[in-house]
């Protein structure tokens, strides 16, 4: 029986070339699997392209709702920002793609899964560790990395085989897009002194262009967005609408030199209007509803959660344990946040929650204040006791010298 290989297919140059390369080098049949995570492309065109490039079968899986509910929402509840800024656009989609690749391999009785990642990027790790976590027995092929395939060689291969790919050596950028955002790299951006130019952006309008502000109210239940301006929405609908509205205001542009998993620093430009607006709102609702010590510790958990996902460890035991912690921490994160979207910023202007720990009667300095200030003196004395005790010791030691 001819060996079968399932290929993670994007429709681009590298994965299109991978189809012919795998067939030539291994004699295997290639089944192309394209997962729709909201990249905004015509998936039927991509499916037909895979067949035209030599795949014996090609599948398109609409995973947009699944991506929103099971991957973007957990990232939102974790306020997931790698290095404090990057909302894990590409990193979030890879474990979902891994899941569908492994399922396809089982359906088609394939013995291997292939991807088109290079040896310099993070995605090779995310694909291979994720696939190995779901089925350790599947072999993994990485033709672009393992054959040292350059862009020039890939173009030459495509031209020699007559592959239906429109590409030129002048195409300057590498772009990865999904529902949660869009990543742009390479080209002139590799000189970190060069400022991004307006033409690279697609999800966000120029924030410097004057336009009326947009006010939006986002409602959450247990940390999950459930309504916008009072209208019930699914996670997919919430992200889609805020991508549109925040994007129209230029919200969510990020220019970052980040620490890649493989040990190099890389300049990346991102646009994630919906993600940035939602995380801004969610963080503020946590400020209102989460107790201080839990909030402090959760910030540490959030950071580690983002690092694990960035590093391709979505299916790891630690990630699962952190998920359980975050789930508990979100039990009271219910309420409404009002945002003003304008000039590239999402600014919180209002908060309300039936679970709020903010008590006006305790916080006010006006008439009606219920805070008993007579208790403060003893609290301050006890709070400062360790510091005063240490100071006396240090002063005595100094005097002894």
Swiss-Prot record:
Q: Which PROSITE patterns match?
A: ARGININOSUCCIN_SYN_1, ARGININOSUCCIN_SYN_2
- What broad taxonomic lineage does this protein's source fall under? Bacteria, Bacillati, Actinomycetota, Actinomycetes, Acidothermales
**Assembly and interaction partners:** Homotetramer.
Q: Name one GO cellular component term.
A: cytoplasm
Residues bound to L-aspartate: 118, 122-123
What chemistry does it catalyse, as a reaction equation?
L-citrulline + L-aspartate + ATP = 2-(N(omega)-L-arginino)succinate + AMP + diphosphate + H(+)
Q: Which Pfam families match?
A: Arginosuc_syn_C, Arginosuc_synth
Q: Does the keyword Nucleotide-binding apply?
A: yes
The molecular function terms of the Gene Ontology recorded here are: argininosuccinate synthase activity; ATP binding
Which family does the similarity line name?
Belongs to the argininosuccinate synthase family. Type 1 subfamily.
Give the EC class as a word.
Answer: ligase
Species of origin reads Acidothermus cellulolyticus (strain ATCC 43068 / DSM 8971 / 11B)
Q: What InterPro entries is this protein classified in?
A: Arginosuc_syn_C, Arginosuc_syn_N, Arginosuc_synth, Arginosuc_synth_CS, Arginosuc_synth_type_1_subfam, AS_cat/multimer_dom_body, Rossmann-like_a/b/a_fold
According to its UniProt record, in which pathway does this protein act?
Answer: Amino-acid biosynthesis; L-arginine biosynthesis; L-arginine from L-ornithine and carbamoyl phosphate: step 2/3
User: What name does UniProt use for this protein?
Assistant: Argininosuccinate synthase
| This protein's UniProt keywords | Amino-acid biosynthesis, Arginine biosynthesis, ATP-binding, Cytoplasm, Ligase, Nucleotide-binding
> Where does this protein hold L-citrulline?
86, 122, 126, 174, 258, 270
